[in-house]
Curated annotation (Swiss-Prot):
Name of the protein described by the UniProt record: E3 ubiquitin-protein ligase TRIM17
Keyword Nuclease assigned: no
Domain of life of the source: Eukaryota
SMART domains: BBOX, PRY, RING, SPRY
Organism field: Homo sapiens
Statement: the UniProt record of this protein carries the keyword Transcription regulation: no
Zinc finger (RING-type): 16-66
Cellular compartments annotated: Cytoplasm; Lysosome
Function: E3 ubiquitin ligase that plays important roles in the regulation of neuronal apoptosis, selective autophagy or cell proliferation. Stimulates the degradation of kinetochore ZW10 interacting protein ZWINT in a proteasome-dependent manner, leading to negative regulation of cell proliferation. Inhibits autophagic degradation of diverse known targets while contributing to autophagy of midbodies. Autophagy-inhibitory activity involves MCL1, which TRIM17 assembles into complexes with the key autophagy regulator BECN1.
Subunit structure: Interacts (via coiled coil) with TRIM44 (via coiled coil). Interacts with TRIM28; this interaction prevents TRIM28 activity on BCL2A1. Interacts with TRIM41; this interaction prevents TRIM41 activity on ZSCAN2. Interacts with BECN1. Interacts with NFATC3 and NFATC4; these interactions prevent NFATC3 and NFATC4 nuclear localization.
Chief location bin: cytoplasm
InterPro entries on file: B30.2/SPRY, B30.2/SPRY_sf, Butyrophylin_SPRY, ConA-like_dom_sf, PRY, SPRY_dom, TRIM/RBCC, TRIM17_PRY/SPRY
PTM section of the record: Auto-ubiquitinated.
Gene coding for it: TRIM17
Length: 477
């Protein structure tokens, strides 16, 4: 107890009575009291502003004893500076160990206010009715609680670390999978590019072989005809020479030249030259790429030919001829041909749609695009000059008619499933056989004067059906 009391007394001696904190740059007045230099100067600054006269100019009252002390006579107390430093460093003399109000040790703990108090505070009106514990007992309880909280936090830190490690592992695995997929994409495209190059070379080689075979036959025909021409020219010269001879000379031995003339006959080529190469332009995977621009094309019932019936079945939209007809002819309706257009007009971008044909007999059909203001009342040729970019075919034939090629496109088989691709900005309309992926025809470098609509045409009533859909599905039986 004597050590505690001694420590308390030492703490009191090292404490400034103005700020109630350990001395900072302590100074001593002429009356022998000590204060922090900043505290005494602030106190005197306040006193200077108060009314009344001081007994001596430049003197101020001591905050402890009120004795007047000249300001210039403040003396530094270096010994007290050392004492204050020792008190601050001593673990038993920390400022928080004493009550700031009563300067008594904080030996108790108020549970309601959750703060340490001294014995004087315990008897005060503020804490008299509160539950108070000895500080050591409260410390033990809080130590247990802090240990529980720290253990919980340690568990959470461990859990967080495990989660972080798991997420880092997931991140690394994800990046590894993405890297593997990226490498796979690059590899597959390299393989596809190599395959496309090889396929291109194969098609070009086949086309070159076909060109050489046909050209060889044609060259042989040219050479044969050239030989026949020379023989005919030689015979003509002989006959012209004989015709200029005298009568007796002309009549001599006429049997031989006349017999040669009678034996002359021009031999025509045995095989007619093909109108188009047999080698088909077929790019693997092109249809799948074009389907990235797939449109859900819906035929417009308000403008369709009166004898066309539009109906849906299982998400498919069918365009088929109907002999009954609607009997209603608006100004926008096709009346010259069994035609219809799509509801949506395209004025930019790339668009692709597919049409299946279930055509009967030798009916004529046509597919493509047309201007949104084409003539619908008159029978006009379906050519670009009239606003049509279409291909057409009579079922049973193998020649697809176009209006930009001098000769029709020869087909191995009439297509039953067509794909139409419009690139508005490029001025191109391309046609494909979806069944085998072959390219059939392209209108290129076209100048479209306005919006374009998908165009469908059946040659006559009872000619069959067109299946217009974005997805073709069937169940294998």
């Amino acid at each position: 107890m004597e050590a505690v009391e001694l420590a308390r007394k030492l703490q009191e001696e090292a404490t400034c009575s103005i700020c109630l904190d350990y001395f900072t740059d302590p100074v001593m007045t002429t009356c022998g009291h000590n204060f922090c230099r900043a505290c005494i100067q602030l106190s005197w600054e306040k006193a200077r502003g108060k009314k009344g006269r001081r007994k001596r100019k430049g003197s101020f009252p001591c905050p402890e004893c009120r004795e007047m002390s000249p300001q210039r006579n403040l003396l530094p107390n270096r010994l007290l500076t050392k004492v204050a430093e020792m008190a601050q460093q001593h673990p038993g003399l920390q400022k928080q160990d004493l009550c700031q109000e009563h300067h008594e040790p904080l030996k108790l703990f108020c549970q309601k206010d959750q703060s340490p108090i001294c014995v004087v505070c315990r008897e005060s009106r503020e804490h008299r009715l509160h539950r108070v514990l000895p500080a050591e007992e409260a410390v033990q309880g809080y130590k247990l609680k802090l240990e529980e909280d720290m253990e919980y936090l340690r568990e959470q830190i461990t859990r967080t670390g495990n989660l972080q490690a798991r997420e880092e592992q997931s991140l690394a695995e994800w990046q590894g999978k993405v890297k593997e997929r990226r490498e796979r994409i690059v590899l597959e495209f390299e393989k596809m590019n190599l395959y496309l190059v090889e396929e291109e070379q194969r098609l070009l080689q086949a086309l070159e072989t076909e060109e050489e075979e046909t050209a060889s036959r044609l060259r042989e025909s040219v050479a044969c005809l050239d030989r026949q021409g020379h023989s005919l020219e030689l015979l003509l010269l002989q006959l012209e020479e004989r015709s200029t001879q005298g009568p007796l000379q002309m009549l001599q031995d006429m049997k031989e030249p006349l017999s040669r003339k009678n034996n002359v006959s021009v031999q025509c080529p045995e095989v007619a030259p093909p109108t188009r190469p047999r080698t088909v332009c077929r790019v693997p995977g092109q249809i799948e790429v074009l389907r990235g621009f797939l449109e859900d094309v819906v035929p417009d019932a308000t403008s369709a030919y009166p004898y066309l019936l539009l109906y849906e079945s299982r998400q498919r939209r069918y365009l088929g001829s109907s002999p009954e007809g609607s009997g209603f002819c608006s100004k926008d309706r096709f009346v010259a041909y069994p035609c219809a257009v799509g509801q949506t007009a395209f004025s930019s971008g790339r668009h692709y749609w597919e049409v299946g044909m279930n055509i009967t007999g030798d009916a004529l059909w046509a597919l493509g695009v047309c201007r949104d203001n084409v003539s619908r009342k008159d029978r006009v040729p379906k050519c670009p000059e009239n606003g049509f970019w279409v291909v057409q075919l009579s079922k049973g034939t193998k020649y697809l008619s176009t209006f930009s090629a001098l000769t029709p496109v020869m087909l191995m088989e009439p297509p039953s499933h067509m794909g139409i691709f419009l690139d508005f900005e490029a001025g191109e309309v391309s046609f494909y056989s979806v069944s085998d992926g072959s390219h059939l025809h392209t209108y290129s470098q076209a100048t479209f004067p306005g919006p374009l609509q998908p165009f469908f045409c059946l040659g006559a009533p009872k000619s069959g059906q067109m299946v217009i859909s974005t997805v073709t599905m069937w169940v294998k039986g």
